[in-house]
Amino acid sequence: MIDIQTTVDRIREILADETTAQLAEELNGFHAADLADIFQELKPEERLECFNLIDEDKAAEMIEYLPPNLQVEILGDIDTDLAARIIQNLPHDAAADVLGDMEEDDTEAYLDSLPKKFSAEVRELMNYDEDTAGGMMTPLFMVVTQEMTVKEVLDYIREKAEEDNIDLYYVYVTDTQDHLLGVLSLRTLLTSSFKTKVKDIMNADIVKLHIDDYRDTISDVFMKYQFDSLPVVDQYNHLRGIVTWDDAQDALEEETTEEIYASSGISTGSIDEDEILEGSVFTSMKARTPWLFVTLIGELIAVNVVNIFDHTLKALPIVAIFIPLLAGLAGNIGTQSITLIVRGLSTGQITTGSMVRHILRESFIGLMIGAFFGVLVTLFTWGWQHNFELGFIVGIAMAINMALAALIGTLTPFSMKKLNIDPAVASGPVIATAIDVLGLAVYFLLASMFRSEERRVGKECRS
């Protein structure tokens, strides 16, 4: 692990001294991932100067680790022939992603300049959504027939893997029409007799991905089965490519990032994470505004609730002091519940079949926590205002609101799931609005009842 900022400062010193030979040696000595971190901290002109000092193979490795906007920027700034060679050195799926982020004219120009076989394979990948198995797969994999012997397979691997630069994870077995029949691990090959036929040792119980599977499905399958790669098939079970574990990790990271954004009411949709962080102000507004309208409408309803109980506020202005306390604690426990359920639904630990059990469980937990904090708030208010009745009202409201918040926080994601709406996107704004509206209504209703009872007792005493 290197200190990125210290390294960047050193690079700038070397650039200032114009000792490029020394800098070239140092840059090529870094791991591609570290080099990508360094490049993200450099200014555009510094990036270009440093990039021209890196070997082409190292440059291609580093490009994979850069965010899309920087990939396009760097390749657009360097010589076109050099950029084409670097793209050719990328894995097919990475090349498809990079070219897909460019302007259409630039994409076509590069595809026309690349070797025909490579260009055709990349074009095919670009036909698929980059977040599906078709867009993430690589067409480079090892395939054999079931009638081959172990010795024939091993000889074939030695020849083919080096020739096509294939990263070898598993060997796949197909028929003459490319239908996927089975899979072989390297361990099985190395521990079997040379004369054994593939059909006798292959695993026909295949875990596979469909070409249209989205990244959440891909991540779930990899997490469940822990394979280094998975085959990708079309609707006719033709083997089309493989998705490797590192690509699945990238998909999982993107999925997690999207869920985090969604839980805050940021609708990514077709907008990339990099566009939200580094793109135009309008792009960021477009991602963040939609669900704020839901919150706006909900809070206007909450304002109307306060207005309905205006007479209570005038008679007991002190109740307004406790509104932030009630809203804050109810909001927090609601957020806790919603986070647990949304994450559980995402990972498969929670299913819609267990909905009732989780609703009852979270509601009970919310009630218990609410009762605990309700007692604390009652005692605090009694000690502070010397008014037990007021403290009791605030405490009861606290217990009810926290139980309601936990219930809403649990019920909302399940409801969204049933309606085929992403629970992560909608749940945050919905629960915030619902908790505020219902919480205020419960609180003011209790306060009004307390005020009415107080007035009734006062009249009886006067009479």
Regions found by a protein language model. Name each.
Residues 1-270:
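Hydrophobic packing positions in regular secondary-structure scaffolds
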Residues 209, 434-441:
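Cytosolic juxtamembrane regulatory segments of multi-pass membrane proteins
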Residues 184, 243, 330-336, 460:
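Gly/Ser/Thr-rich beta-alpha loop segments that engage phosphate groups in nucleotides
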Residues 106, 121, 402-403, 407, ...:
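Mid-bilayer segments of alpha-helical transmembrane spans in multi-pass integral membrane proteins
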Residues 454-461:
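Conserved small/polar residues in nucleotide/adenosyl-binding loops
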Residues 17, 44, 56, 80, ...:
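Membrane-interface junctions
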